[in-house]
Amino acid sequence: PTPHLDGRHAVFGETVKGDEVIDIIAKAPRDERNRPKKDIKIKKITIIANGKDAKAFNAVEVFNNYFKIIEVRKSKGIEAAKVLNEEFKKQEAELKALPSGIKILSVVQGSGEKPQQNQLVLVNYAGYLENGTLFDSNIKEVEEQFGKYNALRDRQNGYKPIPFPYTPSAGLIPGFKEALLTMKVGDKIRVFIPSSLGYGEAGADDVIPPNSNLVFDIEITDIAK
């Protein structure tokens, strides 16, 4: 069973001849990772397309269109980042840094309550490199705007407010955590975070380069019940 592939790869087919080969593969000796100890190779396979839709399917065209869509999304993200980069520059220049080094711009002043320490707050966020490149958001419209929309994430209900612990000991980058703790329910802010209060010299995988200054848009939508 491969549940990690659910919703990602869907292949439907039926073996019409050669069931004995499948039985042999199923009984092949396996290693500790449940893989055959010796490589099993398909030397020839014949796919029979039944039905009008199946016969009309053009794999080469679909393959080429996929990469065209990727290029369009990439261009969309680059253009959106350019606009946001200029906005970041103007805004940051007018803000005064807090003692830690972060700068906070109040976008919306909410009328909700101030969370108590150790409560879970529901948060919408969008994280950017300082050049305006979006690296992550749980807001569907933002990811669409920057060509980052993920259909799998959407199917898994990943575009919704995420619970974060409202406490100084939360496992968040320091700059994000400090900004979050200044907020009450309904507040929307934009916080400029120096790399030392972000992911520092290490960066984060291939998403955030080392020594990257970051910008986050943060909104507390509610307190988790």
Predicted features by range, described:
Residues P1-K225:
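Cross-family detector of peptidyl-prolyl cis-trans isomerase
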